[in-house]
Design a protein with these regions (language model features):
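Conserved donor NDP-sugar-binding/catalytic core segment of glycosyltransferases
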Residues: 394-429, 493, 505
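A conserved acidic beta->alpha catalytic loop
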Residues: 328, 343-352, 393
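Short aromatic/hydrophobic "clamp" motif used to bind/position activated sugar donors
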Residues: 386
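Aromatic-rich peripheral "rim/lid" segments of glycoside hydrolase catalytic domains that contact
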Residues: 255-305
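Extracellular glycoside hydrolase catalytic/binding regions
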Residues: 142, 147-247, 274-276
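Short, flexible, basic/aromatic active-site loop/helix in glycosyltransferases
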Residues: 417-418, 432-450, 465
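Short, acidic, metal-binding catalytic loop of nucleotide-sugar glycosyltransferases
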Residues: 327-336
């Protein structure tokens, strides 16, 4: 990490992934705040030039490279900064502490002043970035509403960018208003003051997800020496800065340089945040900050102890991109790394290009697919950690530095990071990057991932070997999902490193995008065969949150914000609302096919003779209905809903920074961008469905990885199973108990129980609770309408004996509730029609028979599930040397809200 040199030929600073780049070099912000100062006779709120020069010289000696101001500095201050090798984060002051949006004239002046200031200072070599606002008070945000504030700041950003397109802009937020959606800005900046290291690091991890693919800047950090003491100030300020750098921020700014502080019309004398006092005498905090800045982001002594990493690149016909990939790997700053290229039977020049890099080990392997190639690299790796990336990826120089951090500081078996499309990719690839279906991460919380993409992941070598590496059945995709789920099934966790970013070249044509989605669809089918508990009705069930900037996914991920009583919470609570798959229904192939069928039927209806009268069911009176017109309207509604949503997502896609297409300008190119993005939204689910069908044709070669050594046939239910099922269906439960003269480990028994259930034939869909529910350990699906939840307990008794207890409860899913209501309506409608034609007796008989058949099928499925669980529990307990105790029914428990709320989640996973 380097500071910017004194500029001769000025090049505008730019965003470089999760960091900043100045003069074509990585620039890690090591800053201090400067001001605000008392205004002089001319209203300038900066010290005299001699004092400014003295301050800047002391800053440079303390390894500071950035000065943050809260008022617009005179050009002389910027000149002094560049003379001392400093950059300036320029703050634009305006009256944000009053309801400014209530005064249109004030809003106009704010915009004009901001645009004029940035246009005037943008070309100065000292200008690093511009802060267009700082901590709009929560009361003002509540007064105007968050959406109006967001819209104002977004429009202000766009106006300034139009006037100075190369300038970097940020808005400095703070925790009370963290819920503001300000992803348009180039840098995500936050002022944060937390005095416990664990709390600060946890909050920085959260802020990294708010920042997304943008750099995160800790814009203020430090503490008051009056209240914490001089040594306390030094310790806490150093902790703040160290945490920011090691958590992957693009920099940190210490608040403040001096105790000289003027605010609200007068000096502030009861706070002392300065690294130096008013007379510029250094405090202990200055030496602490100097040491942190000199070692940032990680001390050399710490880096020397990091483990060796083997980077494996699997390549097939990658001659177009492999050189760029290996060149970027050669620039890694990680201290101990080896690079292995597995040439997976390429027919082009991939192997020879890779051999042109002398520090790269190339292994030629017969074409066996992606997973097989990953296993070849795993076998050849000598590092303690094995990192994987793709041949069409360009890595950041500090990629490995941050990717290994979760494995160094937390109990995780692996880690992954984000991937973004390079800015220099062609326009078709830029559109593909804004379409659904691309690789992204799924987070269980701010640090633990459920899935990380295969182009950016690393694992401990021994963890991969413990599960026999990658499953070679995954030829092109799905291997990353499979490996994460298999590690989690063993109780291991996968971390996330937000600063370990790679640039991933996306498909450069619609045809290539289609082939990719078909491949993903195949992999989904095979994943369903391997991990049936992770699917419901053919749909993949994620417990975590899919992090993506795409409007397609963000539109479905609602949230609720609790800002505390009267908006006074220092750290608001933000809750993600549940996303149900019904929200994606208009994008499903079934919806599209049904809409087309209805549309075609409506158009051709007259030719097919669809002119018979329909019945008004509520009265039984005949009512003439134009059937073709009704079908046409239904088909048009379905098609326009799908097309409208695709167009909406394309319209809401972020096109900032994209170049013009050919000879077209940026403005002229936007319709073409949006049209193609909308088309990709339309074809993506169709491609996945095509892949699902192809995967089914190969499913016989996909054996479940959860089969134990002793498969067993599910039993024929007995009378006692029917009685137990009856108790379950009427709201009760069942319980079994087993006695052991020795201590029994509950986790061991549960692991065996899951294995036995998954070994049953026919196969059972078993969902293992991963910490989200306290009232169940595992669940067995009952058809598609319900769950049989099983909870276990091991009681410790005298002399090392123990009692193993299991109990089961039946709960219908949300989907079952909807289906039941639908069936009831259909039966009622059918009965009405039947009565009109055949009379009451026959109609009632048919209705009763139909309802009885449905109920009997549900009862049979419940009985069979009870029998399977009962026998499986008995097998596990007997194998552990336990003796069964007499059967006893569990007490009835009323759960009035579970079907409507909690089971909405269960129906998804």
């Amino acid at each position: 990490m380097t500071s910017g040199p004194r500029a001769v030929d000025h090049k505008a600073p730019r965003v470089d992934g999760k960091f900043l780049n100045v003069e074509n070099r990585r620039f890690l912000v090591k800053g201090v705040t400067y001001g605000t100062f008392a205004p002089d006779g001319d209203g300038i709120q900066f010290p005299p030039p001699a004092r400014v020069a003295q301050d800047f010289a002391l800053m440079a000696a303390a390894s500071v490279n950035t000065v943050r101001t809260y008022t617009v500095p005179p050009v002389g201050v910027l000149d002094a900064a560049i003379e001392h090798g400093l950059r300036v984060m320029v703050g634009l002051e305006w009256p944000q502490h009053i309801p400014f949006l209530d005064d249109p004239e004030l809003v106009r002046r704010i915009r004009q002043g901001a645009v004029a200031t940035v246009r005037r200072l943008a070309s100065h070599p000292a200008a690093l970035l511009f802060a267009v606002g700082n901590e709009i008070p929560p009361g003002i945000v509540r007064w105007h509403g968050a959406r109006r504030i967001e819209r104002f700041l977004r429009e202000l950003y766009e106006e300034i960018k139009t006037a100075a397109p190369d300038s970097l802009l940020t808005y400095v937020n703070f925790p009370p208003t963290e819920y503001l959606d300000l992803d348009c800005f180039d840098v995500c900046s936050f002022n944060v003051y937390l005095h416990r290291d664990a709390d600060l690091r946890a909050y920085l991890a959260r802020l990294q997800h708010i920042a997304g693919h943008k750099p995160l800047l800790l814009a203020e950090a430090g503490c008051d020496s009056v209240r914490e003491g001089l040594d306390g100030q030094a310790r806490i300020t150093a902790m703040h800065l160290r945490a920011a750098f090691t958590e992957g921020a693009c920099g940190a700014v210490a608040y403040s340089w001096t105790d000289e502080w003027w605010r609200g019309g007068g000096p502030v004398n009861d706070w002392a945040f300065g690294l130096v006092d008013e007379a510029r005498n250094p405090k202990p905090a200055l030496a602490a900050v100097r040491n942190i800045f000199a070692d940032a982001p990680f001390p050399a002594s710490e880096r020397a102890g990091w483990p060796k990493v083997s980077v494996v690149v699997c390549a097939y016909n990658a001659a177009d991109t492999i050189d760029d990939c290996l060149t970027s790997l050669a620039s890694l700053t990680y201290p101990s790394v080896e690079v292995i290229v597995v040439n997976d039977g390429s027919r082009d020049a991939t192997g020879s290009i890779a051999r042109g890099h002398p520090d790269v080990r190339v292994i030629d392997a017969p074409k066996g697919g992606l997973s097989a190639a990953r296993n070849v690299g795993l076998a050849a790796a000598t590092g303690e950690i094995v990192a994987y990336t793709d041949a069409d990826v360009r890595v950041d120089a500090d990629w490995l530095t941050y990717l290994v951090q979760p494995m160094l500081v937390a109990d995780v078996a692996g880690a992954g990071g984000p991937n973004v499309v390079p800015h220099d990719d062609p326009w078709l690839a830029q559109c593909v990057a804004r379409a659904p279906g691309g690789p992204t991460h799924v987070m269980l919380d701010d640090r633990i991932a459920e899935h990380v993409p295969g182009c950016n992941m690393a694992f401990r070598r021994d963890a991969l070997l413990s599960i026999d590496g990658f499953n070679p059945v995954y030829l092109r995709a799905g291997d990353d999902v499979d490996i994460c789920w298999r590690l989690q099934a063993k109780g291991l966790r996968v971390g996330f490193a937000p600063a370990a970013l790679v640039w991933h070249h996306h498909r450069g044509s619609v045809r290539a995008f289609w082939r990719q989605q078909v491949g993903y669809g195949e992999a989904e089918t095979w994943l369903d065969a391997h991990h049936s508990e992770k699917f419901l009705g053919g749909q993949m069930l994620w417990h975590g949150r899919i992090y993506s900037p795409l409007p397609f996914l963000r539109s479905a991920a609602g949230r609720r914000v609790n800002t505390g009583v009267w908006g006074t919470a220092a750290f608001p609570s933000i809750y993600s609302t549940q996303t149900h798959r019904w929200q994606f229904l208009p994008h499903s192939p079934l919806w599209m096919a049904a809409s087309l069928v209805l549309l075609i039927a409506g158009i051709t209806g007259e030719l097919m003779g669809m002119d018979a009268p329909w019945l008004l069911l509520s009265t039984g009176e005949t009512m003439e209905v134009n059937a073709p017109l009704l079908l046409l309207a239904a088909g048009l509604l379905g098609c326009t809903t799908t097309l409208g949503r695709c167009a909406t997502f394309a319209w809401r896609s972020d096109l900032s920074g994209l170049p013009g297409i050919g000879r077209w300008s940026r403005a002229q190119s936007r319709p073409a961008y949006r049209a193609l993005i909308a088309w990709l939204h339309l074809v993506q689910p169709v491609g996945r469905f095509r892949g699902n069908l192809r995967g089914l044709s190969l499913s016989q070669g996909v054996a479940s990885q959860h089969v134990t050594r002793h498969p067993w046939k599910t039993p024929v239910p007995a009378f006692r199973d029917a009685r137990a099922a009856a108790r379950l269906l009427t709201g009760g439960g069942t319980e079994r108990s087993f006695w052991s003269e020795s201590h029994a480990f509950r986790t061991t028994l549960l692991t065996e129980l899951v294995g036995v259930l998954r070994a049953a034939r026919p196969a059972q869909v078993v969902h293992v609770d991963e910490g989200w529910r306290q009232d169940r350990d595992l669940s067995l699906t009952i058809g598609r309408w319900g769950w049989l939840h099983v909870q276990t307990l091991v009681e410790d008794h005298e002399k090392g004996s123990s009692l193993f207890r299991t109990r089961a409860r039946l709960r219908p899913s949300f989907l079952a509730t909807v289906q039941a209501l639908t069936v009831a309506l259909l039966v009622a409608a059918g009965t009405s029609v039947s009565i009109a034609f055949h009379g009451h007796s026959a109609s009632m008989f048919v209705s009763i028979v139909g309802i009885t058949a449905i109920a009997a099928r549900a009862a049979w499925q419940a009985t069979r599930a009870v029998a399977v669980v009962d026998r499986a529990v008995a097998r596990v307990a007997t194998a552990a040397g336990m003796l069964p105790l007499p059967l006893a029914p569990a007490p009835r428990v009323s759960h009035p809200a579970e079907t409507t709320l909690s089971e909405t989640t269960l129906s998804r996973g």
